[in-house]
Amino acid sequence: MSLQDAHNSSSPSQKLPLWVQCLEHGQGLGLPHYATEGSAGLDLRAALPENESITLSPGQRALIPTGLIFHLSPGFEAQIRPRSGLALKNGITCLNTPGTIDSDYRGEVKVLLINLGQEDFIIERGMRIAQTVIAPVTQVEVRLLDPNSDLTSSQTDLSNQPNTGRGTGGFGSTGQK
C-alpha cells in the first residue's frame, strides 16, 4: 500500500474516542481539542481556581492540574508534551517529556512545568499549558538470555549478531553534525 493509499483510506470520521471525565475545578474550560486539522496534539489547559495564578520563577517547577481524567482504551497511552510556543518565547517546558499517562491510570492528568527562561512566568486559569498525543503502546515479554545454554531455532542467537558501527556507544557517541 502506498503512502497516498494509506492516507486516502483514513478519514477524520474514523477517529478513536477518548473518554474524558471533567472534574469540578475543570468545568468551563472545554474539552481538549486539536488546534488545526493536521495537529497531532490536543491542547491541555490549566485548571487553576478562578482569580488565582501560579508564578513560575526561573528554575522553578510546578505541577499544574488540568481538571481532567482520561479513560484511555487498552493498548494506548497519552503522552504529555510541551507547547513549542511557550518553550520558544518563555522557556516554559514539561520537565518529564514526554510524560506518560497509562491506560489503567484513573487519576487527574497533571502537567509538570518548569521555567527555563530568564523571567517570571504567570500561569492563569484556562491557559494552554501543554499538549497530549494519544499513541499506541507495544508491550513486550522480557526474556533473559542465558549465554551458556544452547539456543534453539525458536530463540534469537545474539552471539552471531554482527558488530555495528555504533557498538556500545551512547550519549553523544554519534556526534552533533
From Swiss-Prot:
Mind telling me which NCBIfam families this protein's record contains? dut, PRK00601.1
Per the record, where are the segments of Polar residues compositional bias?
150-163
Binding locations of substrate: R83, S84, G85, N96, T100, I101, D102, K110
Enzyme Commission number(s) of this protein: 3.6.1.23
Renumbered to this chain, region (Disordered) spans 150-177
The residue range of the signal peptide is none
Kindly list the organism's lineage: Bacteria, Pseudomonadati, Pseudomonadota, Alphaproteobacteria, Hyphomicrobiales
Is the keyword Transport in the record? no
| A Pfam short name | dUTPase
| Protein role | This enzyme is involved in nucleotide metabolism: it produces dUMP, the immediate precursor of thymidine nucleotides and it decreases the intracellular concentration of dUTP so that uracil cannot be incorporated into DNA.
Protein's recorded name: Deoxyuridine 5'-triphosphate nucleotidohydrolase
